[in-house]
From Swiss-Prot:
This is Centromere protein W. The keyword Nucleus applies. The lineage of its organism: Eukaryota, Metazoa, Chordata, Craniata, Vertebrata. PANTHER family: CENTROMERE PROTEIN W. It comes from Homo sapiens. Highly expressed in ovary, liver, lung and pancreas and to a lower extent in breast and gastrointestinal tract cancers; such as those of the colon, rectum and stomach. Overexpressed in high grade breast invasive tumors. Expressed in many cancer cell types. Belongs to the CENP-W/WIP1 family. Heterodimer with CENPT; this dimer coassembles with CENPS-CENPX heterodimers at centromeres to form the tetrameric CENP-T-W-S-X complex, which is a subcomplex of the large constitutive centromere-associated network (CCAN, also known as the interphase centromere complex or ICEN). Interacts with NPM1.
Length: 88
């Protein structure tokens, strides 16, 4: 592997959550919704976890179909599975 493709495990991401954007979207879509101070962070974390699960599941689908590239079909199939699991 080339040196530029190796990412250090100890390096932490310093980017912050887009709190202003999330609050603006909440107010625009649901003006009657009242959230506590860290409610937007919980929504952001939930979105990140969903995207992470979606990436893992779609990668599994791509490997199962012996494809090196994750296609649209892999992502859609993974989304169906994840949304079924999250319904409870």
């Amino acid at each position: 592997m080339a040196l530029s493709t190796i990412v250090s495990q100890r390096k932490q991401i310093k980017r912050k959550a887009p709190r202003g954007f999330l609050k603006r979207v909440f107010k625009r879509k649901k003006p009657q919704l009242r959230l506590e101070k860290s409610g937007d962070l919980l929504v952001h974390l939930n979105c990140l976890l969903f995207v992470h699960r979606l990436a893992e599941e779609s990668r599994t689908n791509a490997c199962a179909s012996k494809c090196r590239v994750i296609n649209k079909e892999h992502v859609l199939a993974a989304a169906k599975v994840i949304l079924k699991k999250s319904r409870g």
